[in-house]
């Protein structure tokens, strides 16, 4: 059964990679050159002309794939992060490396704290009902 699960994961990964490749790198029919967004109406002058031959979403045109992934917005921290991580991980590592099973002692098992016989229990219940 393990090989079946591995095969399913491999097929799913292959389909995902094929979908990404088809969306970005395979030739597409009737593809227009991507253009930047239209300028704001406050900056439009007489030079703005409506061009009806450029790509839009209704024309099935797609922008080109980005060259790289998006970068993080937050700046990198200059504080050392290793020390708090080590302090936080130390108790977990200690607990994982210790043996949680206590060694068994030789001899019969220890007696329970309060073991009662059946007659003692019946007497106790009868006295409680009176």
UniProtKB/Swiss-Prot annotation:
<dbReference type="GO" id="GO:0005886">
    <property type="term" value="C:plasma membrane"/>
</dbReference>
<keyword id="KW-1003">Cell membrane</keyword>
<comment type="function">
    <text>May play an essential role in M.tuberculosis replication and survival inside the host cell.</text>
</comment>
<protein>
    <recommendedName>
        <fullName>Lipoprotein LpqS</fullName>
    </recommendedName>
</protein>
<feature type="signal peptide">
    <location>
        <begin position="1"/>
        <end position="23"/>
    </location>
</feature>
<keyword id="KW-0564">Palmitate</keyword>
<feature type="lipid moiety-binding region" description="S-diacylglycerol cysteine">
    <location>
        <position position="24"/>
    </location>
</feature>
<dbReference type="GO" id="GO:0046688">
    <property type="term" value="P:response to copper ion"/>
</dbReference>
<keyword id="KW-0472">Membrane</keyword>
<keyword id="KW-0732">Signal</keyword>
<feature type="lipid moiety-binding region" description="N-palmitoyl cysteine">
    <location>
        <position position="24"/>
    </location>
</feature>
<keyword id="KW-0449">Lipoprotein</keyword>
